[in-house]
Structure formats: C-alpha cells, structure tokens
Amino acid sequence: MNIYFMGMILSMIVYIVLGLVISRQVKDVNDFFVAGRQAPTFLIVGSLVASYCSTGLFMGDVGEAYAGFYTPFMITAMMLVGGYVIGSVFFGKYLRRSEALTIPEFFGNRFNSRPLRILAAVTAIITMTVYLLSVMQGIGTLMNYVTGVNYNICILLALITFAVLTVTSGSKGVLITDTLMFSIFTGASLIGVVIIVGKLGGWTTAVTNVTKLNPTIFSWSGDLSHLYPTGTENIIWAVMTGLTWVAVCAVGPWQSSRYLMAKNEHTVVRSAVWATIGVTLLEFFLPTVGALLNVYSDQIPSASLSMIWATMNLLPKVLGVIVLTGVLAAGISSATTFLSLIGSSVANDIMVIDDDKKKLRYGRVSIIVVCVVVMILAYFNPPQIYIIMLGVCETPQAA
C-alpha cells in the first residue's frame, strides 16, 4: 500500500462519514432533492465546478491537449464557459423561481404535459447513467495506475463511497462535499501547475522546448493525425463541440439542477459568474500544462495519464497526494451529482408517489440499482473516458 492509496482511502472514509453526519439534517424530500433551497453562492459554485470537472478534465481534456489537439480543444473550452452565464440568466433564475424539485418537473409544469415530464426524466436518467460510467472508469483507471490495486477493486471502492454518500445525505450532502472537493482539487491543481511549469524552466522556456520537439503542438489545426485530416475540419469540429457544450453548461441537468438549490435568484446568477471564472482557470491551465508535458513523452505511458504521471513524478510527494486525492474527489463529486439526479428523476417524475417517505425510499433504491448497473458495465467495458463523455454530450438529449 503506497502513500497515494492511503490518501485516497482516507479521503473516501472522510466523505462517507460526512455523508452520514449530514444525513441527520435530511428530514424530507425538499432536503433530499434540493438541499432545502437554502444554498449560498459558495456552495452552488463549488458544486457547479466540481460536478463539471470530474476525471474527464484531469484525464480526458488534459490527454487531448497532450495528444496534439490543444488549439481545437481550447476553442471548445473557451466557448463552453459562456454557457454558465447564459444558462443562469435565461433559464436558471426561472428554474429557481418555479420551486420545482427536478428539471423534468419544471418542464412538465411549464408545458402542462405529463408525457413530456416523463420523457425529460428518462432522457436525464440515460445520459447521466452513461456519463456516470465514464466517471467510474476514470476513477478506476486513476486508482489502478497510481496504486497498482486491481481495477475492479478500485471501481468497487469508489462506488461504495459515492453510493453511501448520495443515498444517506442526498443533495444536501452532495452540495457540501462537492464544495469541499472543489476547494481541494482547484487549490492543489493550480499550485501543482506553478510547480510543474517551474520545473520545465518557466512558461517561455517550456513552450520553446516543447515546440522544438513537436512544432505542431500549438498549431491552429491541431495534430492532423488525431481526428480529422485537415485543419478546417478540426476547427469546425471544435466550434460545433463548443456550441454543444455551451448548451450543456447552460441547461444540462447536472449543471442547471444546482440552481434549484440556490437561496434565491441572485444567488443563481452570482454563482454562474464565479463558476465561469473557476472553469476557465482550470480548463486553460491544466490542458496547457498537458501539452507542455510532451517533453517527457518518452516516459509518459499514455495521453490520458499525462497529468497523473506529472503529479507523481514532478511534484513534492505530499502535494502529489493532495492533487491525486483531489482528482479522485472530482470524480466522486460528479458521480454523486449524477446519482442524486437519477434518484430524484425516478421518484419524483417517473413514478407517481404522493407520500414523501415513499418518495425518499424509492429515490434511494433507484440510486442503488443504478450503482449496480454501472458497476457491471464498468467491469465488462474497457475504459474509454473521453470518448464516452464526448458521446454523451454531443447528443441532443444531453443538452
């Protein structure tokens, strides 16, 4: 058992204990599904950024930049952050005003249509389950590489953590732990960026060295062997993907559902502005460092593990443990958000239940069922983190 595994296990125990403690404050469906609608700006920002990042940022996005697709990817990333403000102003504040428990309920009431409400719920459940699979595989890949522990054991440990956290404390626990996780991985990651760039000789030297090694790493077209054979096609892909992600960040259920928990409409808009700043910082600095890590290409095992390798080999041991624990936390954060949404959609939108206690019970049972399904899929499916994440979000349903 190495120090990284010990750090990850300790963090999982902390999250489980927090979930059990917070569960004492969960009295009804309002607490379980929308955290009592009393969340301040800091908690909403923490949950927005934490549920966005997951392992997809640290392994998928950074991996794409490392693989030579930096400029097209950066176009997409800098476009998508605008979705937060757009979504909060034109959708989020009205969502909060509706006082619905779920987004499908909002649409069902808005258009006075029970079938539409069910369709929205089914769509959310399917997309969130697939995205959850992506996160689960990312966590398993991370833990397996860092600790050497069997991949299946890793995903089982992760599943137990976010299942217990979500089932016991619901959205209230998810909000608080999301914010804790956000603080850990954002702070540690940005400090890590400074140290890694320093070891590369500073920004100017690092860029000079990596472009000597790979002259096309920062080219406008990206690596023409990575996706499409022409720069024009790659840029078109980047813009179209960026527009898709604008919609996802604006109205995607795993993002906009946070607004249902906000204290008021002002909190919704303020949170979106701060989330835009947070995601911009992370999406710029981490993939940029990922591209610079090409100077170690002979030592890095794969693109998706580039930042993980740098954390283990270029950072001080203690900071490395904190960063990797933060990456794990980001994955767990996204997973708890998805599970919370799935549970609320099943109990509140698909099933017709008037009794609050039964609604809570069915919501928790549905979370457990989805966990088992995702565990089975993750066991038989090879990890394809970025492909699954991208596939989910490039469907009309995800937006």
Summary of predicted features, one role per range:
Residues 121-134, 165, 183-197, 236-250, ...:
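Selective recognition of specific alpha-helical transmembrane segments in multi-pass small-molecule
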Residues 50, 74-168, 236, 240-248, ...:
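Helix-loop-helix module between adjacent transmembrane segments
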Residues 20, 54-64, 71, 128-142, ...:
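Transmembrane helix-loop junctions in multi-pass membrane proteins
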Residues 31, 99-108, 170-180, 251-284, ...:
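Hydrophobic, small-residue-rich membrane helices and short re-entrant helix-turn-helix hairpins
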Residues 110-118, 125-129, 344-382, 393:
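Loop-to-transmembrane helix boundary motifs in multi-pass membrane proteins
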Residues 39-42, 72-74, 111-118, 147-157, ...:
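Membrane-interfacial loop-to-helix junctions in multi-pass transporters
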Residues 33-100, 236-248, 255-299, 308-330:
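Membrane-interface helix-loop-helix modules in multi-pass membrane proteins
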